[in-house]
């Protein structure tokens, strides 16, 4: 079996496992407390909505320009530049985020986004960096590992944070810290 065929098979298996984990959790576990599960889903959805503003296509530029940069021996420079770009974009995004809520201060009172900013903003940075790493590693025909981080880890984060909160009686802050910690672990991995 070739490398591509093995990677494709493993990719499919990970996808099915992610589907199975999500389905079992949604049917049997999350209905115990839909309010807290809704908060977790809001945080993840808001984060996923804001990540493209920070990444701004830099993750896909690693795939698109990788061949040319590798020919010139500068593919590591392209990767480093992408990481610096994400850092700069995140700072600009933070400036815009706080400027928006400063200018339109009435949104601060009724906005869940503003209330959850201490969790959402670090997750935006972590997931933006993860997007760059995941696309970069795909240049080396390694698609299974990023698929684990993109499909399995969010479901494990939801399930773990929910279980900590509902079944083990941990506070929301501890559950949110676990939720963020799983994504940080995915970035480190």
Predicted segments, located by residue:
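Membrane-interface junctions at transmembrane-helix termini in multi-pass inner-membrane proteins
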Residues: 5, 65, 127-150
């Amino acid at each position: 079996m070739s490398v591509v065929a093995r990677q494709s098979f493993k990719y499919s298996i990970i996808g099915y496992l992610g589907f199975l984990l999500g389905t079992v959790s949604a049917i049997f576990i999350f209905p115990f407390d839909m309010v807290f599960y809704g908060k977790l889903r809001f945080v993840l959805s808001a984060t996923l909505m804001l990540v493209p503003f920070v990444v701004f296509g830099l993750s896909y530029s690693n795939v698109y320009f990788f061949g040319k940069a590798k020919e010139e021996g500068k593919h590591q420079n392209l990767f480093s530049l992408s990481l610096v770009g994400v850092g700069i974009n995140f700072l600009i995004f933070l400036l815009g985020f706080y400027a928006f809520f400063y200018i339109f201060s009435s949104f601060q009172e009724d906005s869940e986004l503003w209330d959850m900013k201490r969790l959402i903003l670090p997750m935006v940075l972590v997931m933006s960096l993860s997007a760059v790493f995941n696309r970069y590693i795909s240049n080396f025909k390694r698609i299974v590992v990023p698929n684990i981080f993109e499909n399995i880890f969010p479901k494990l984060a939801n399930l773990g944070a929910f279980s900590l909160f509902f079944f083990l009686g941990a506070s929301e802050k501890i559950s949110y810290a676990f939720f963020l910690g799983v994504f940080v672990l995915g970035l480190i991995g």
